[in-house]
């Protein structure tokens, strides 16, 4: 814009705009002379504005006051820069006419702009919400006695550390304005609507609504349910039931003290701790004596406790509660804190007496503790508890799983000494539970217990190590304590990884209830948890840290225990947490260098994807080397306990593993997968034993491999037989070792000893193509290919078919600097594509990623073509011969001679390779073959064009270009093969097109033959040249290249002329479409080699709009032929390019079939009336243009790649786009056909457009408010209304008398009555939505317009009382339930329009000073607050 708005500031862009009868507000981004960005709020007051001058001044006064960073450094307020005011002269005093307020600019946007990002993460997390909450509490505390903000909403908080902005609605506390209606509809507290006066709790309401909105937006699998309950309490309809700022601060400080060291992510924001410290340092968390703290209760076995954290996991009925603190103990603690602060000079006995007195006054009653007794002699109720809660049926599967996990820990000799200590576990038993056991303090609901049973595990969090070190001074945490904690975790994780179930190991890594505890030595009298008597010792809190155990003995003499992550279900996925992350519990605050070395080695080994047991063994070996040094440095610290356990662990493990104990982890080689590069889960151990060398290949859960069990003996015999081949360098199979405990197979092969000495040279991950020249790499490639072909020939003489089994290639650098091939058979049988991939593997190993090669030229192009050919042939072979298992109408036939021929044909530099053993056969059988239908074709070449794979499409496909030769006739074809994502079908349909339609100047070429089924489609063309796709011309990423547009229009022309015989995939001769560029080119190749554009209409529409029209093409064709559609949207959105292109205009204007359907609208905007309404000129006539909708689902698809409103979209949000298909298969969602795209009939939704055409069909005589036409452009739907000069809305009219008002009232009542008869209620009647026109005789006519939020009768009930609309004209029952009638809800909604009409008339009466008693009484009756007393229309 660059328009100077005020002072030195230029407008950069408009952010928001708002206007009502009193004022107009515009928010701009502006630039100063230095091009720095600022926010400018422009406020323009109307001539009849009711806002007094003091209120106008408060716009900048409050902001300026609280922007003082010296006085208020802790407030995150949008900082005031300066302001400008423009005055209007009046007789009595000067009023502000305009004002401009300049504030700082924050580029994070406001909270309302937060959207879902990539994969399963969101742009804001739970920790961010809590940090925002804490920052708002700091601001509210400062505002508590000064001002009320009155407009807390997402639009008012900036995302960039979070700043509160827009203090325009704020007011002084306890002033005359305390009952003024100001704020944003969705966030206005009910007490504002009642106009009975209010305090700062209305800001609590608005903040609660904002936090709930954010919580719902970021809600993930696990969240703290307590936060949701707290936010709902803040949104209570009664102001007296909402917590105060002081209560909220006290609650959040207690919550921080109790859960910040647990797995809750509430306080993960790095600045949250600073907010808590601010509260504590200023003693803001200490309540006054008469203020009761917030209590959110949890009911356990009929007893109530105050809860600070509750996580509800969404998997398999699993629940647990963290850190339950008994209400009585908490009251004692609060009273102790209060009394201690008020009476610092009293002695301990006086404090105890005060505590007891306060306890009698404030406690809700004693809590029985008998059910928590550990034994008959000792009463031990922990004041701090962790409750592991497993909801399951006693005797059921889940119950047995959870119980078996506990028994596993108790029976393990190793774990018995490492975990489950008396001081940790208080109780474990199955008891009745309540389905909904979390209630707020004021909840009176009585929920009967169910018959379901559960397992409770009560643990004492007083000894939690994370909490312990959090409250401990940094200097007291010594190196030996840190080492003992790390050693303890190493022993625990090894025992679970070696002998425990996988899902327990995964849960342990993810820290689900897995907790490390520090216990005082047994020689010391252990501090007991308090018993609820008159002499109870207060529970440690933020003001009394838990450090009593550290003061009585040296910290190094404490012991560690572990509570395992017991689960009532089996993990179905592997943990994403790495071992080095699990062990890193101290961050950067380590006190011993060995810990740094442990974490560094663990991180390196994590990358190798070695089994956890093997990683830990290496860690222990490194630790053992430092044994003497550590025992000398940290004497009498208990480290010898861990070293003794390490030695026992290593001895037992090596004794158990007869062969695998010999494994040297420094000698490991990974296997290669052709398409997925290096496989980190497939590898060999290379070991040495008795002067022989072995390769040990581990496999987990081998029974999952298809056909292995039933063919196991045959397969192993063949492996043994292969090892006798004299010339092939193969791994000699020795035996298979089975580990029953871990359900793992170890395949042992004997290898040449020299391989053991060159293992590091063999590692494929370290092979670099930059170490050799281009010629050297080609020489290496030749050598390896010769070896491989000769080996294949020998293998073929011993085995009927080499294609039934796949094998792994190992490439070794020998002593003479030559590379040699070694082989080992894969344990995955029946992989026919393995043979082809072996050639691809060699090329990939030698040349690396060809796409990243720096050198260019013909040789690189040919290498790329060859390897691409092998990869495509491998994929086709796998699908046809394996997945299909013979149930397909197409199949691949090939042998090693074919691969050799393609090698020489596509890589001419290898023509000097001589392989005499089969050289004489080459002329007779040189091509691989494909059978399509019942016809055989030679495969001349295979090409993968530039195409985008889309995993969401139901008919998404891989496109391959096949150059084929029909064996019977030697005819050559270009075949385009599409691979759908469906299971193979043997039945096929063959379509022959004897007379292809080339009537469009021979530009469009149809296929001559189509063979297809539900799974694959082969389309044959008699052309020879280069095939390109629309992606080759999609440089702007919007498919608006002129070649694409011309092809699109040509195809539409072909489509309308031949709707009955249309094929959806055709070729266009690029030389004829883009003849201007071709003719002007000096490139001889472009003129001599034909080029064709593959235009697939299915693919084009899918890429543009996400719509699959494959199964609904007839419906789609009818839509685009009869009315505006996405096709006309494409044309209209590209009208400038089309109008300037002779070919495009010739197609549209000179073809009747096109001209009647598609036309270009040149609409020029004359004036912008509102963000969605413009005065325009079209075809020399004036119109009102209004945006009445958008292709909403298409917009959503373009942004997210899927329709998130679909009920299964949670799969996308959870797993991300990459893993959606596999996730859907796991969740059984694959059968929902509508999931993959947008239904044709649903892509364009506009409720207003439907209503407008419905009204037009019911009216006998059209008027100037009737829609004349609509069109689509840039994915938006625009309606066009005729414009009549002299018309205006009622807010703009300047002269009305009493008779005019009566006439207007009559007309509007009649129109609302008509709407009611048609089943429509308007929902936004106001002066701005009523158009008036005065005739020459003085008469006036009015019409209701703008049906943007109108509703049909019978729609969802929640829409009836939606807060959409204009505040000040909405019926009060929208905001207050008690004002709603008891009758039929479907009739009450029309009374809302009556109320809005009454408010509109009241506005006009006041504006024109109408004193008619009759009219005023009539309007008063229309605006009665109770629905039963309002007039009917």
Curated annotation (Swiss-Prot):
The keyword ATP-binding applies. The keyword Kinase applies. Residues 332-362, 533-550 have a biased composition (Low complexity). Keywords: ATP-binding, Kinase, Nucleotide-binding, Repeat, Serine/threonine-protein kinase, Transferase. ATP binds at residues 1-4, 41. One of its GO terms (molecular function) is protein serine kinase activity. The protein kinase domain 2 is predicted to be catalytically inactive. This is Probable serine/threonine-protein kinase DDB_G0277989. It comes from Dictyostelium discoideum. The lineage of its organism: Eukaryota, Amoebozoa, Evosea, Eumycetozoa, Dictyostelia.
